[in-house]
Structures are given as C-alpha cells and as structure tokens.
Amino acid sequence: RLVGSEMCIRDSSYLTIACPDTDKACTIARRLASSFIKTSVSNDVAGIEYSSVLKNVYAIAAGICSGLKYGDNFQAVLISNAVQEMNRFLQTVHPLNRNVNDSVYLGDLLVTGYSNFSRNRTFGTMIGKGYSVKSAQIEMEMIAEGYYGTKCIKEINKHHHVNMPILDAVYNILYERISPMIEIKLLTDSLR
C-alpha cells in the first residue's frame, strides 16, 4: 500500500508540496493536512520531480536483485548507493542546497524500493526471476513507470555525464537485453 491507498484507509502519511511560490505551497499544504496527513513544503520542484523518476528506477533495481535472490545486506548497500547516485545527479542537473535524506527524497525511495506493493519493485522482481520485459508488463496489468523513466534519465544523463552505475545497469537489462545475472554481478563491483 503506497501513499494513495494508505490515505484512503487513514494511515498516517506525509506529503511534500513542491512549488516555486512558498505562499501557494503553504496554502495547499494547510488544505491537505489532516489528523493523519502531515505536510511540508519545498521549492525544489525540479529536484523532487527528478527524484520521483529515479526512485522508480532504483526500485526496479532492488526488485531485480530480489528476483535474483540477493539478500537484505546487498539490498541495503544497493539503496545506499542509489541515494548517493541520486544526489550526484540532482546536484549536477539542478544544483540546490537540498538534503536528500529528507523524506521527500529518501523516504520516497525507501518505500518504493522496499514495498511489496510497489509496481516498480514488482516489475524488477519479475525481471530478476527471468521474465522478459514484455511478459512482465503484460502479466502485471499495471504500468511500472520506472521502465520509461530509466530511458528518460539515461537520455538526460548523456548531456551531463554523471556516474550512474545503477541507472546504467537497469538500462542495460531493460533496453539492451543484457542478462540481469551478468549485469548485477558487474554492478556489484562499483558499489561501495
């Protein structure tokens, strides 16, 4: 259950309202806030948009590793490296004084990367278990937007040349049809 479904059953949720106009963001945040929805505001619209795409890519990576039976320790290292990779990309594409440990960045990445309700993690798990991209998409009957986000960020990064080994691995698996087992093994050498 991700944010939308949790809000429907009144589970505690946290939302960040991103807007270049702080007054408007505060107005919207006040209107959305409730006993079970906590809100905050940010002016980092582009950074939050990029991180929202990247978290889906990293959730696919986490799912692939899960499907390949990598353990919890490896998953933690993968996500730790994903946070660093996201920060490098954000600081290059949209330099701003931001803290990627804030819930809008890290929290969103963690829930999408670890939740069994995440479409992107589920898609990645299927790929890791040997499904083709097409067969995983058909069986899921939902859109794993990270599939498209991977290609989009890869194209943007051609102009910025940020070191993004996790993005590159996911791209190679999804679009170049490199074996997940081989590509993730290669990725392990670049993780710290």
Each model region followed by its residue ranges:
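Single conserved hydrophobic/aromatic residue that forms the stacking wall/gate
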Residues: 1-9
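Short, conserved glycine- and acidic-residue-centered signature motifs
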Residues: 1, 79, 146
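Alpha-helical elements of the RecA-like P-loop NTPase motor core of helicases
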Residues: 6, 26, 121
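Internal alpha-helical scaffold of NAD(P)-dependent oxidoreductase catalytic cores
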Residues: 12-99
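NAD(P)-dependent Rossmann-like dehydrogenase/reductase catalytic/cofactor-binding core
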Residues: 55, 62-70, 91-192
